[in-house]
Structure formats: C-alpha cells, structure tokens
A protein has these predicted regions:
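Canonical tetratricopeptide repeat
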Residues: 59, 66, 93, 126-127, ...
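Short coil turns that delineate tetratricopeptide repeat
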Residues: 51, 85, 118-119, 151-152, ...
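Helix-start (N-cap) detector for alpha-helical repeat units in TPR-like alpha-solenoids
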Residues: 54-55, 88-89, 121-122, 154-155, ...
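N-terminal leader/linker segments that initiate helical-solenoid repeat arrays
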Residues: 13, 17-62, 66-68, 75
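Canonical positions in the second alpha-helix
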Residues: 45-46, 79-80, 113-114, 146-147, ...
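Register position in tetratricopeptide repeats
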Residues: 32-33, 66-67, 100-101, 133-134, ...
Length: 449
C-alpha cells in the first residue's frame, strides 16, 4: 500500500517516498545520498514513462532545489501544481522556491493557495513572510489574522504580533502579546516587543515594569534581550548593557551601544573592544560608522576609510575625512558632493582652500559660516579672504570670531596677517603676539624674522 506524502517543511526533508518500481527507488536513494544531479535525472526518467507520478514530481523539485537549480525547481513544482492542483505540497514548495528566487509576490500567491487547500500554520507563516518581503506589511498581518485559530503555537502568535507592529497596528498587537505571555510566560521576544510598544505609546514606566516581570520569569541567555530593552529605556544604561553583553556576547546591539558610549566619552581605543566584536557578529552600517569614527580619532586612516566605505551613504563624510588625511583631496571632494550637511560643506571649503582654490572655498565657507557662525569655519573663511587679497573683509570676519572665541590662536594669527597687509604694523604685532602666546607656531616663526 502506498505511503502518504508528508508535508514539505523545509522542502520535504525525509521524504519517505513510495517505491513503485526500481527507478523510483533508485531516485530516492540518490536523493537521500545527496547526489542531487543524478537523482534529478532518475526522477525525470520516471516522469518520462508516467507523468502522473506524484512522488516523482515532488522528488524532482526537491532534488533541483537542493542542487541550487532554482529556476528548474520552480518549473518542476509549477508542473506539479498543474498536474495535481489539489495537492498542498506543490503549492507550498513553489512558494519556498519563489522566495529563494527573490519573487515575494509570486511566493505569496503560492502560499495563499497552499493555505486554501490546507490551513496549516506553516502555510500562513509562509504567506505572511512573502507579503512582508514584498513590502505589504498590512496584508501580511491580515493573512496571519485570517489563519489564527485557538490551537496556533506561540511562534505563530509572536509572528502575528510582529506583523501587526510592522503594519503600524501597535495597539492591536498588545492583546496578542498578553495572550501569548499568558500561555508562555518565558517568551522573551514577546516581553521585548510588548515593552517596546508600551514605550512608543508613551508608557515608559509601564514598559519598565513589564520588563521587570519578564526578567523575573525568563532564564538564561534570553534575558539579555530584555536587559538590552531596559537599557534603552534607562537613564543609566551602561550597567544593564554590560550585563546583557556578558549573558550573550552575540548580542551585537549591546556591544555596539557600549562601544559608542566609549567613543562619545573620548575613548576610541576602548570603543574598539566592543565595536569590533559587534561588527564581526553583525556587520551593520551603524557599527561600521562607529568604527570609522574610532579609527579616525586614532589617526588610523586606512581603517577609517575602510569602515566608512562599508557604512554606505551614512559614511560618506567620514570617508572623505579619511581620504583627505591619506592625501587624496580630489577623491574627498568627490565624496562630499553627495553630502549636504553644513559640517561637510565647511570641510569641503577647507579642502578647496588647501588646494589653492580660494574663490571656490570662499563661496562654500561663506554659506556655511552664515548658517552656523562656527569659529572654526570662520577662521577658514578669513583665510580664504586673505588668499584673495580682501584684507578688510577678512579683518571684519576675524574680529567677529574673536568676540565669540577670544582664545583661538588661528584667528589671532590670521588677523595679524590681515592687519599687516593693511599696513597697520602695531596692531598686527599685537595680534601675532597674542597668537604666539596661545601656541601658534606660525606666529612665533613670523615674530622671529
């Protein structure tokens, strides 16, 4: 008697196919041995003799899928659903293949049909996953709501809550999460999402209370995620982050936040001790950006450039800074074309000034200084005016800067140069002396002449 065909999750592991004739037996043996190419040929032979063999259609699709021949696997399962449109396995496996091919819309259609034929948990989860990948968060949540029954597992209920959250239905996710936690009080991910939602709804104190309830129930490494969430809501996060990281060193977010805190505290070398493990665990753009900042502070410009590049668009400014430090000014200017922040524009102006392109530098720096009145930018603006021989304008800008930052040596030095060029030697001497007293090597050298 023929054995029933089992469900295909993930893609029919342990097929247990019926043995109708030696060629089918041989195909199954080849599949179990991992000889997928030969198994596919054997299944094709069976189908050439009898295209109505369910087991051969199923086995062929699995063999091709495992061999990485996804388009052929898609065709095999497509044929299976045409010959056996009432069979759940074909539609479900076709959905799996479409997901691997990066075609979530087609996958959603296949999973929807599978769910219609057999309203299984995995079919609805596959359907929702495909819709989410297609950018249809609300539809994903609706699919899981449609498939919700009293016997659904905690994993299904968590997926539903996550889908509702992704769809912007935070309040609707809350009763789902409480229902899940009533059944499974040790579900750390549910406690985490519940606290996140409560905090986003403005109920921070309640979120912290729920996290404490969760921490009293959850055991082992799973506690780390709750400690991380509590740290994000706490005014003193570092002890909680350290506890979370000690519990679960693979929790890259905790390592990243610890590293970023060290970087902001002016300890770039200490930051690397956390940021490098975080990046090895999960090479996220924000971690790469923090690494670039740490290496830039340490004057390790090749590594700063590398990690800024890996950070993507958010790393363009740091990448430009590293490129300039490596002597690649033209590249730095090209990188800054895509960055509109005032800080980046001020940096662009300083590079143009270094390259002797004072007229271009003046336009960029004047815009940046007018917007922000930064003394550092103003010094470069004054330098560009000096380079263009506009000494009176330079004096006005530099005196304005010195009212805000009277101990800025570079401003006093540039003012001295402007006054000297205007023929006001006594005033120039006083300005240069002040610059020298504040540590300007250039002013000291000029005074010794």
């Amino acid at each position: 008697m023929m054995k029933p065909i089992p469900k295909a999750l993930p893609l029919l592991l342990g097929l247990g196919l019926a043995l109708a004739q030696p060629s089918l037996e041989q195909a199954e043996a080849l599949l179990k041995a991992g000889n997928y190419a030969q198994a596919a040929l054997a299944y094709e032979e069976v189908l050439a003799r009898d295209y109505g063999r369910l087991e051969a259609h199923l086995g062929l699709g699995v063999a091709l899928f495992r061999a990485g021949r996804l388009e052929e696997a898609r065709f095999a399962f497509d044929q299976m659903v045409r010959v056996f449109p009432e069979r759940y396995e074909g539609h479900f496996n076709l959905g799996q293949v479409y997901l691997r091919l990066g075609k979530p819309q087609e996958a959603a259609g296949a999973f929807a049909k599978a769910a219609e034929l057999s309203p299984s948990e995995e079919a609805y989860l596959g359907w929702a996953s495909a819709l989410a990948q297609a950018g249809q968060a609300k539809e994903a949540a609706e699919a899981l709501k449609k498939g919700l029954t009293p016997e659904r597992s905690p994993a299904y209920r968590l997926a539903l809550a996550q889908a509702l959250y992704a769809a912007g239905a935070r309040a609707e996710a809350v009763p789902v999460l409480y229902g899940l936690l009533n059944r499974d009080p040790k579900a750390a991910e549910a406690w985490d999402l519940l606290a996140r939602i409560l905090a986003e709804e403005g109920l921070k104190a309640r979120a912290l209370r729920e996290l404490d309830r969760g921490l009293a129930l959850v055991e082992g490494k799973a506690r780390a995620r709750l400690l991380l969430r509590k740290a994000l809501l706490s005014p003193s996060p570092e002890p909680l982050l350290r506890e979370a990281y000690a519990l679960d060193p693979s929790l890259w977010e905790a390592a990243y936040l610890l590293g970023r805190a060290r970087l902001e505290a002016g300890d770039p070398r200490g930051a690397l001790a956390f940021l490098l493990p975080a990046y090895r665990t999960s090479p996220e753009p924000e971690v790469a950006l923090a690494l670039a900042g740490a290496y830039l502070a340490l004057k390790d410009y090749p590594n700063a450039y590398r990690y800024a590049d890996e950070a993507g668009p958010s790393g363009l400014f740091l990448k430009a800074q590293a490129a300039r430090a490596l002597g690649r000014r033209v590249e730095a200017l090209e990188l800054l074309e895509g960055v509109n922040a005032l800080e980046a524009q001020a940096f662009k102006g300083s590079i143009l000034l270094e390259m002797g392109r004072a007229e271009e530098a003046l336009g960029v720096l004047r815009t940046a200084y007018t917007a922000q009145k930064s003394p550092e930018v103003g010094v470069n603006l004054g330098a560009s005016l000096l380079a263009l021989g506009r000494f009176g304008e330079a004096e006005l800008v530099l005196r304005e800067i010195l009212q805000a930052a009277p101990r800025m040596a570079a401003a006093w030095y540039n003012l001295g140069l402007a006054l000297k060029a205007l023929g006001r030697e006594a005033e120039a001497q006083r300005a240069l002396t002040q610059a020298a007293n504040l540590g300007s090597a250039e002013a000291k050298a000029l005074l010794r002449r």
